[in-house]
């Protein structure tokens, strides 16, 4: 007999049948996390493989959505009443926090896929009560369904919120495609407690690529560094975290002042009254968290950050009152009812000038956050703040532009923008590329140019490496980089160590000569951009290598790229794209705390590659000889320049014994197991394809007797994918 309380599967009432217990990654945490290369699988997507969000968005009645959002702003709900009778400030915070996770160093985070709906973001302390904002939006999302993504709706709600309170926004672009599970590739920090700050070392040096001061915060601690109410010290944190989100000092001041022109924070009582976050809340709460037992738990009794601050006398109307109040008073430290540090005017000044959010008969004194006072007491911020105070029109313009940048920074080029409110002005941070202004080359010209390239004296590795260097800057995280624009010939890319500047100049000079000669003599208005020619040269090199290896392949090439200018290229903005490691070229700039194989997986994930695509590209690039500095590490072949499966057959050969090279833990020597005769050298990136069980399984496919043709075809397909990663025009077609 089986007791009703006993699980019929495991025989134990306390056991779980899925996902519990020690995973293999718990047992062996140093193995590379290959799951990031298969996240967001079609199997997790309820929309199906044929769903085209861009086409659905074009069917959207955009004006109707905005009208519904505008009506929602003042339709206060009993279950979560609107502060001051207006939900605008709540939706501004929701949109800000959706976009504000973006960081420049790896392009991850941001609003681009609606990740605020999922853990960990949906349960971050800094996102307290934003679950209510999304539930308020659900009737509108339900009404318009697949025609607008959650990712777009959250940002649009923030825009409409601003407009409904009298602010003129810079514009809005749709095109953010929802994902359906949490991101696994984003490193949010190593801390295992909320608000932990192990991310700092030395003199408050923030760990890369993080852009927030503590675990679970979007940017900074509003009470000050580690809760210490020091406005000047807080300014240092503000400057660093906002810079890591691509904001300069002026944009930072505009965003803080503009955002804090509206609404309030919530700290009506002690945090001990607040229940668990959404992911830890009981099932009957249906995904809502932070249930409070303080009074009614809502409205005037709401507890959020623990701070109880209302910045201006007009919290639902755009004004310059934030700066007026900031500079009109001398401030003294106080505490909120929840015990959080905040500031109020000295000697009771300003009493009765600020409305209460839920009781029209009550009036309050102005209050400010420690980080608000940073705008007055940091000398650089103070100068900017006073300028905006004296020039409110310039504040409005700066805030509009900074808000647009904040909410669109991770969308990539303007070609991805959708909708009737896309601004006409091209902005430098959008990495602009000129529109095609000539007739594109066709099959005949492509064949002619391939012959010219292959007869130019450039080697196969030089052709392949240059194209790879150009295209592989692409980041699927924020859709930046790629071959379009030919920015590899411009600063800063032309000087990056990984691109071997001297070798690059030689290759580009030859290709530019071919380009100029062709463009002078071609008929019918046909021209070729250098961006196209660089990719075509790489494709020609792959084709030649395949031929040398005995394979007949067609390497896809589609023209349509254009050449950007140096004036269209923000050197500082592009500097963050410089690879510190590129395992595909066997390049490692220096020793890092993270292993070379983990850095390879990270690079592959940014290139949107699967584990098989990563594997086949490594194997092909090695035998072609496309390695940094012409190093022979990983070139496991006696026929370099020929596309063969030699990398895999030799790596998996049990006749080879590998040992680390003395003094270099990242390099290994492979010797004949019987004679001890040296055969090959390889890096950790090379050897992981024989050491890791999953990667070895893939490598075995390509090393098999019947695997060489599949290897050649798969390599060409993966190569073509990387060359076209930034061709959003092709994806739309």
Swiss-Prot record:
GO terms for molecular function: catalase activity; heme binding; metal ion binding. The active site is at residue 97. Binds 1 heme b (iron(II)-protoporphyrin IX) group per dimer. It is an enzyme of class 1 (oxidoreductase). Its EC number is 1.11.1.21. Keywords: Heme, Hydrogen peroxide, Iron, Metal-binding, Oxidoreductase, Peroxidase. Its cofactor is heme b. There is a cross-link at residues 219-245 (Tryptophyl-tyrosyl-methioninium (Tyr-Met) (with W-96)). Residues 1-24 are annotated as: Disordered. Formation of the three residue Trp-Tyr-Met cross-link is important for the catalase, but not the peroxidase activity of the enzyme. Pfam families: peroxidase. The record marks 93 as: Transition state stabilizer. There is a cross-link at residues 96-219 (Tryptophyl-tyrosyl-methioninium (Trp-Tyr) (with M-245)). GO terms for biological process: cellular response to hydrogen peroxide; hydrogen peroxide catabolic process. Bifunctional enzyme with both catalase and broad-spectrum peroxidase activity. This is Catalase-peroxidase. It comes from Methanoregula boonei (strain DSM 21154 / JCM 14090 / 6A8).
